[in-house]
Amino acid sequence: MALGTELGVSWPGSHGSCREQEGQRQRGPGKPTWGLSRAKKRLLWRFFLSAFGFLGLYHYRFIIIRLIEGSIPMGTCPTAIMPLPRDNFTGVLHHWARPEVLTCTSWGAPIIWDGTFDPHVAQQEARRRNLTIGLTVFAVGRYLEKYLEHFLVSAEQHFMVGQNVVYYVFTDRPEAVPYVALGQGRLLRAKPVQRERRWQDVSMARMPTLHEALGGQLGQEADFVFCLDVDQYFTGNFGPEVLADLVAQLHAWHYRWPRWLLPYERDKRSAAALSLSEGDFYYHAAVFGGSVAALLKLTAHCATGQQLDHKRGIEALWHDESHLNKFFWLNKPTKLLSPEFCWAEEIIWRREIHHPRLLWAPKEYTLVRN
């Protein structure tokens, strides 16, 4: 047998080059085969792409959810209602100036957005009536060192500028309240309160404490009162345009959500419970206000509801905020503040938020609640 025939190769000259015959070269015994078919490669690539997609969705889920939420329509003020809402401080409201947002409620109360009111008219009306506005804030435990000074300094710059203001700081350490230079016609009173062991109890103690203060010195020296959380700060004018008999704040995180998704208390045993067919908006307990008479009614309702829940051995999902939302369902607010008046920077940019007036401070719960 010829050598070339035995080895299965062709010599140069026979076909122009030395090459294998009978197809591909055979692999040696015991050597693994790493080649994948085209179908298997496609499946592998799809797996990796899906895995990276799910990882990206998990990592950026907050941004994606907020982008989707921003596309939920808010609705518009019905033409039949638009001429009706007026304001005792700003006069006729310009609802047509903000067609992209809801500027009134179904019961005819205005929702205050930037551009819908004239701030100068409100300031002049408040001065004409020589009003005194109370601002209450609770600074208990580490909330005092962490937030109070920034809150007060920013309030002096932006809250009811040019008006008579009395600050009521409720704290377990009145002697530690920082000194802040106050303008003419502005006072600060530090009021002692007991420090509770749980932060939930601190939150729920607010309503009975406010009720007592409104029935005492605060109610005697203030015409209107606003109750704010301390872990936020003013960044823009927060003036008399916000004043009304009963004022509620739309929650920045929930103002576009449909009603059935709102985090109301759903436990029927709770005094704060709302059914799936109840509720108008979700209101933020970080900002609410009104006349002394209206706030006496509000704080009494919430304090009583909390006591009933305590006797039943339950707590509402969002504590005093849940009871506040129940009150506003039963007693419609006469004015609503848009999320511009209490905004969270963690929420991605929204085109309808023109000038935030109040911003949430960074939440450091592990520090201030322990």
UniProtKB/Swiss-Prot annotation:
Could you tell me which residue ranges are on the Cytoplasmic side of the membrane?
Answer: 1-42
**GO cellular component terms?**
Golgi apparatus; Golgi cisterna membrane; vesicle
The UniProt catalytic activity note for this protein reads: a beta-D-galactosyl-(1->4)-N-acetyl-beta-D-glucosaminyl derivative + UDP-alpha-D-galactose = an alpha-D-galactosyl-(1->3)-beta-D-galactosyl-(1->4)-N-acetyl-beta-D-glucosaminyl derivative + UDP + H(+); a beta-D-Gal-(1->4)-beta-D-Glc-(1<->1)-Cer(d18:1(4E)) + UDP-alpha-D-galactose = an isogloboside iGb3Cer (d18:1(4E)) + UDP + H(+); a globoside Gb3Cer + UDP-alpha-D-galactose = a globoside GalGb3Cer + UDP + H(+)
**Positions annotated with a glycan in the UniProt record:** N88, N130
Q: Where in the cell is it found?
A: Golgi apparatus, Golgi stack membrane
- List GO BP terms, alphabetically: carbohydrate metabolic process; glycosphingolipid biosynthetic process; lipid glycosylation
What is the membrane topology noted in the UniProt record heading this document? Answer: Single-pass type II membrane protein
Sequence positions that bind substrate: 138-143, 229-231, 251-254, 363-369
Q: Which residues lie on this side of the membrane: Lumenal?
A: 66-370
GO MF, one annotated term:
N-acetyllactosaminide 3-alpha-galactosyltransferase activity
Cofactor(s) needed, names only, are:
Mn(2+)
Domain of life (superkingdom)? Eukaryota
Q: Where does the entry say this protein is expressed, by tissue?
A: Thymus and lung.
Cofactor comment text? Binds 1 Mn(2+) ion per subunit.
Q: What is its EC number?
A: 2.4.1.87
Keyword presence, Repeat: no
Q: Where is this region: Disordered?
A: 1-33
Sum up the protein's function in the record's words.
Synthesizes the galactose-alpha(1,3)-galactose group on the glycosphingolipid isoglobotrihexosylceramide or isogloboside 3 (iGb3) by catalyzing the transfer of galactose from UDP-Galactose to its acceptor molecule Gal-beta-1,4-Glc-ceramide. Can also catalyze the addition of galactose to iGb3 itself to form polygalactose structures. Synthesis of iGb3 is the initial step in the formation of the isoglobo-series glycolipid pathway and is the precursor to isogloboside 4 (iGb4) and isoForssman glycolipids.
Q: Which family does it belong to?
A: Belongs to the glycosyltransferase 6 family.
Domain remarks:
The conserved DXD motif is involved in cofactor binding. The manganese ion interacts with the beta-phosphate group of UDP and may also have a role in catalysis.
UniProt-recorded name of the protein: Alpha-1,3-galactosyltransferase 2
Q: What is the organism field in this record?
A: Mus musculus
